Amino acid sequence: MARLCAFLMTLLVMSYWSTCSLGCDLPQTHNLRNKRALTLLAQMRRLSPLSCLKDRKNFRFPQEKVDAQQIKKAQVIPVLSELTQQILTLFTSKDSSAAWNTTLLDSFCNDLHQQLNDLQGCLMQQVGVQEPPLTQEDSLLAVRKYFHRITVYLREKKHSPCAWEVVRAEVWRTLSSSAKLLARLSEKE
């Protein structure tokens, strides 16, 4: 009986905490890692973007699905987690390692991995709190399709240096937009 009461009390406290917090507080280092990842990505540039103009492509970043002004606060963590996971997957592929300075690539991927750990910790706290809204599922699917287009592009271009430069610049813009999503977390509703 005592165990049942303790269990019910724990559930009550957890549901109260999660309804009040809409997720969790990311460590202060999360923002710093995001800024550092942007800096590292800029330093990874090997070619002038001007030399790769013929390779440019519009990957159709799903801005309307991940817009910091329109997205609900409860959706920010899952969307950021998906963005970070997709970027990490892209840059840890065997084809990626040949394109970049290994030291910069390792630092970049380590920062992304730490960010992903922070975000997944928050996601674990959200499990069972609420059903994901359909708009969140739409956002996650849009992010996956966006990165699928990038992967297909790299394959079509045979992972050429210019293709990777185009993708690096695109991912830099994507990470910049994730900084706006991070700012959304600290806003009052």
UniProtKB/Swiss-Prot annotation:
Cysteine pairs bridged by disulfides in the record: 24-122, 52-162
PROSITE patterns according to UniProt: INTERFERON_A_B_D
One CC-aspect GO term: extracellular space
SMART domains per UniProt: IFabd (SM00076)
Entry-linked Pfam families: Interferon (PF00143)
Alphabetically ordered keywords of this record: Antiviral defense, Cytokine, Disulfide bond, Glycoprotein, Secreted, Signal
Residues linked to a glycan: 101
Molecular-function GO terms, alphabetical: cytokine activity; cytokine receptor binding
The keyword DNA-binding belongs to this UniProt entry's keyword annotation: no
Coiled coil found in the keyword field: no
Organism domain of life: Eukaryota
Main location: secreted
Gene Ontology biological process terms in this record: defense response to virus
Location(s) in or outside the cell: Secreted
CDD domains cross-referenced by the UniProt entry: IFab
Span of the signal peptide: 1-23
InterPro entries cross-referenced by the UniProt entry: 4_helix_cytokine-like_core, Interferon_alpha/beta/delta
Annotated Gene3D superfamilies: 1.20.1250.10
Family assignment from sequence similarity: Belongs to the alpha/beta interferon family.
Function per UniProt: Produced by macrophages, IFN-alpha have antiviral activities. Interferon stimulates the production of two enzymes: a protein kinase and an oligoadenylate synthetase.
Protein name, per record: Interferon alpha-12
Organism of derivation: Mus musculus
